[in-house]
């Protein structure tokens, strides 16, 4: 049963100090309050709390759109076979992540490679995640893993079944260049194709080079900063400067390459092509703060404004994948993160903390207007806790385990 089945109360979010919009073109907002009705943002600024059933006073803290992990290795259920961890998605919500996008359920034990098997896996994952929402999280799962046996008819059928994601890089191809027919077939059916980029990630896979990416022209260059092994510098420059490919940067990649990609993207005005993800759970581990840590790194080590970097992990991804949530905008779902500088940080507010590389403290996470976390069990304590009227106990699972 969906975790979002019960409508959220009419909620006013007040005393906002800084508003991040998730819009790469205008990453800061001016509203000091928000009104949420039926899980959606219906008013920005000037909110009268009289009719609100719940008031969340953020005490001058920052309100931002929920983060979207654009590279999260889900399989089925809130469990990762790769790291044998239960409940990781529920924990990721405490890292500000309100949506994740699957790059293919490749960690399924005994994953099939035949056409009927990979189609069945994509459909069952899509169906499962359509109604399974750990702690309210929206999981965009069911990505078809491209194999040489798949035909155009297969992709057209998959599209009728609601499959809208595909991953290239783990199929049984002798040469990745041979995947061109499947990439084009998926795209022609309206399925978004993410391609592995860089060196081989696991035994049995193979490197995807710049030549492959320029030939295949996927919709998204997955972990273009390495997953975890990066492409060479000159290749990265070509992909940024001479193509319109989406540039996905991940925590489990090469930080040096990520910094180079950001610098080039800023130089050529390609900010709208950058999105962020964690590329976890993988051998790198399970990282509830993976996206937030990536934001802190890029906001402190590049010339990108922290609000723009946050937008790369929210609204920019929503634009690429045509997601409803991801921006603080009228009519959008109220997927929100309330955060401030962590207690003891020398940064001023969440933006100041990020600018010096500190992970902000999260004091509330809302998904579709419903409070899913108050005191985050994963971030440092926020310098400014929220106050909820009437009083609301911390949702189950919020406790720190000492």
Describe the role of every protein-language-model region.
Residues 263-342:
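His/Asp/Glu-enriched, well-ordered alpha-helical/loop segment
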Residues 1-50:
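N-terminal metal-binding scaffold of metallo-dependent hydrolase/deaminase domains
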Residues 81-89, 147-158, 204-212:
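Short, acidic/polar
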Residues 333-387:
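C-terminal cap of metal-dependent C-N hydrolases
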Residues 163-285, 302:
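Active-site core of metal-dependent hydrolases
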Residues 88-117, 129-146, 160-173, 191-194, ...:
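Divalent metal-dependent hydrolysis catalytic cores, especially in the metallo-beta-lactamase
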Residues 12, 66-68, 193-194, 276:
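Residue-level marker for buried hydrophobic side chains located in beta-strands
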Residues 50, 58-123:
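Metal-associated gating/positioning segment near the N- to mid-region
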């Amino acid at each position: 049963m969906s975790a979002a089945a019960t409508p959220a109360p009419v909620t006013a979010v007040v005393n906002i100090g800084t508003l991040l919009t998730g819009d790469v073109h205008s990453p800061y907002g001016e509203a000091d309050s928000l009104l949420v009705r039926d899980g959606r943002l219906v008013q920005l600024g000037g909110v009268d709390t009289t009719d609100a059933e719940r008031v969340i006073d953020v005490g001058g803290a920052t309100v931002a759109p929920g983060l979207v992990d654009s590279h999260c290795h889900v399989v089925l259920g809130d469990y990762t076979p790769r790291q044998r961890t239960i409940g990781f998605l529920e924990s990721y919500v405490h890292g500000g992540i309100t949506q994740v996008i699957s790059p293919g359920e490749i960690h399924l034990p005994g994953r099939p490679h035949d056409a009927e098997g990979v189609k069945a896996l994509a459909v069952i994952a899509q169906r499962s995640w359509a109604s399974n929402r750990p702690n309210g999280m929206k999981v965009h799962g069911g990505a078809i893993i491209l194999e040489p046996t798949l035909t155009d008819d297969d992709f057209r059928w998959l599209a009728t079944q609601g499959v809208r994601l595909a991953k290239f890089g783990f199929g049984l191809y002798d040469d990745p260049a041979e995947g061109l027919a499947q990439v084009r077939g998926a795209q022609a059916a309206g399925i978004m194709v993410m391609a592995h980029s860089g060196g081989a990630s696991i035994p049995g896979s193979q490197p995807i080079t710049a030549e492959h990416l320029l030939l295949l022209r996927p919709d998204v260059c997955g972990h273009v900063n390495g997953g975890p092994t990066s492409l060479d510098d000159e290749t990265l420059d070509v992909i940024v400067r001479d193509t319109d490919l989406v540039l996905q940067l991940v925590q489990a990649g090469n930080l040096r390459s990520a910094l180079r990609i950001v610098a080039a993207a800023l130089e050529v005005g390609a900010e709208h092509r950058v999105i962020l993800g964690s590329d976890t759970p993988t051998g790198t581990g399970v990282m509830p703060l993976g996206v937030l840590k990536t934001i802190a790194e890029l906001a402190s080590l590049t010339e990108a404004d922290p609000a723009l970097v946050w937008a790369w992990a929210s609204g920019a991804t929503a634009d690429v994948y045509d997601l409803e949530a991801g921006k603080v905008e009228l009519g959008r779902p109220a997927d929100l993160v309330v955060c401030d500088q962590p207690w003891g940080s020398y940064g001023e507010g969440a933006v100041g903390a990020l600018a010096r590389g500190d992970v902000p403290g999260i004091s509330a996470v809302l998904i579709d207007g419903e409070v899913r976390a108050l005191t985050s069990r994963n971030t440092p304590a926020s310098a400014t806790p929220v106050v909820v009227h009437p009083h609301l106990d911390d949702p189950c699972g919020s406790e720190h385990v000492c």
